[in-house]
Amino acid sequence: METESGNQEKVMEEESTEKKKEVEKKKRSRVKQVLADIAKQVDFWFGDANLHKDRFLREQIEKSRDGYVDISLLVSFNKMKKLTTDGKLIARALRSSAVVELDLEGTRIRRKKPLGERPKDEDERTVYVELLPKNVNHSWIERVFGKCGNVVYISIPHYKSTGDPKGFAFVEFETKEQAAKAIEFLNNPPEEAPRKPGIFPKTVKNKPIPALRVVEEKKKKKKKKGRMKKEDNIQAKEENMDTSNTSISKMKRSRPTSEGSDIESTEPQKQCSKKKKKRDRVEASSLPEVRTGKRKRSSSEDAESLAPRSKVKKIIQKDIIKEASEASKENRDIEISTEEEKDTGDLKDSSLLKTKRKHKKKHKERHKMGEEVIPLRVLSKSEWMDLKKEYLALQKASMASLKKTISQIKSESEMETDSGVPQNTGMKNEKTANREECRTQEKVNATGPQFVSGVIVKIISTEPLPGRKQVRDTLAAISEVLYVDLLEGDTECHARFKTPEDAQAVINAYTEINKKHCWKLEILSGDHEQRYWQKILVDRQAKLNQPREKKRGTEKLITKAEKIRLAKTQQASKHIRFSEYD
């Protein structure tokens, strides 16, 4: 009994050790690639090319006395978040870095060498690329341009509103020679591309950019249509194949199966069966899907049988003959090659060699497809800068002409208002009086509404009041309303009228209003009225003090031009009504 219990304990111990080993194996994590990616990313951030352009990181280094930056700052970057959020793992990855070094605690890093001055030949080493794919990223550009040399920095501008790439990028190389090589080898713009290079998109702030996804969706729809058509063609071919197979199977079934029937059959019956077989062969060869290249007679028989038929069938027959001739040529070549190989060695060895050759050819074709020419336009940055200057000069000229046209339109409109039918002195005096009244009204508006007692009516409802427009319309049917102070969902509101008489008229018409709406109406007076007038002034001041977007330069001109264009279109679209007497 003791021996049995001892054996059981040993078995249990062995099982537990095995389980521990399995757990240890599972715990082991492979982080070589992650460590390499972390080291590469941090080396780029602290490299000369990036630090000369990255103001934020440069300021963080300059703030510290020793030039150290906390690893927690790197963890806050989005690209590092994708790799890891563990500071210890980052420290482990940077131990053998050639660009940065760790402090004694392993929580901070700094550059090994101090940052020098910005190189003067930066623009000469940089190339401008356009006609990029819509979903372009840094890794794609690095893979394409890495063939020409060591890529130091990549800049892909994006739209702020949508986040889509603008369709161009800047690639900085290590040397001028590498940049020149990239311009020489990768500058292959397609025929459809515009003649002049350079994309200078100018969009108004907060204005939606024409979505690129719409174009992509259209392309996807086209692809789907193409696939559907292909599938339909394949189905049609399969149906044709099925019909041909069924016809062949029918002919096979018609043949005699028993041996007794074969002996009893006469010679004329054999001749008929031979003719039927020939017809079957002709039918099989007439189908474009089933190619029988070895049987040359079938194609000639097809030509003889299909000659008296219609023109459409003749065209089909020509295509079939072409296919048959191509297949026969291929077979001839194979026959010649097999005859030569018979002299040299066995047929099996030759077939193996042929298959190998075919595989090699396929692989070569695939490699060629992989090394296809990418349709890009590549220029030097200095050339792009010249194009940018040209574009800005054109923009300046166009804006100047737009400014002139706007001023001309304004002057013409003023002339039209002033000129017209010759006016009397009395009419002129009336005009001047009206102008003075307008000026006084403008002054009043500038100071705000003046205090008038008995003008404000308070409206109370058991349910939430309808919209401001509906309240205004119901009150305006009785007397003129200047303003309705109402927030959405409120049960109380205030209406301001022009004169106390107008407010009193609304109170008098309470019975009419109460039929449609269950409202309580009262004119404010005393302290309540004074408090409300103070509220009006405070609200007005708050509204005036709100920050406004200042439109300047090209934006201001474009908005003015748009307003003029809209006014002209509205005038043009007006319906001209003729009276009965015209």
From Swiss-Prot:
Positions carrying Phosphoserine: 258, 261, 273, 298-300, 337, 351
UniProt keyword annotations, A-Z: Acetylation, Differentiation, Disease variant, Dwarfism, Intellectual disability, Isopeptide bond, mRNA processing, mRNA splicing, Nucleus, Phosphoprotein, RNA-binding, Spermatogenesis, Transcription, Transcription regulation, Ubl conjugation
Domain RRM: 125-203
Localization, UniProt: Nucleus, Nucleoplasm
Record annotation: effect of changing residue 496 to A: Strongly reduced binding to the stem loop 4 of 7SK RNA
Domain xRRM: 450-563
Biased composition annotated in UniProt, kind: Basic and acidic residues: 10-25, 229-240, 316-335, 428-442
Quaternary structure and partners: Core component of the 7SK RNP complex, at least composed of 7SK RNA, LARP7, MEPCE, HEXIM1 (or HEXIM2) and P-TEFb (composed of CDK9 and CCNT1/cyclin-T1). Interacts with METTL16. Interacts with RBM7; upon genotoxic stress this interaction is enhanced, triggering the release of inactive P-TEFb complex from the core, yielding to P-TEFb complex activation. Associates with box C/D small nucleolar ribonucleoprotein (snoRNP) complexes.
Similarity annotation: Belongs to the LARP7 family.
Notes on the domains: The xRRM domain binds the 3' end of 7SK snRNA (7SK RNA) at the top of stem-loop 4.
Name of the protein this chain belongs to: La-related protein 7
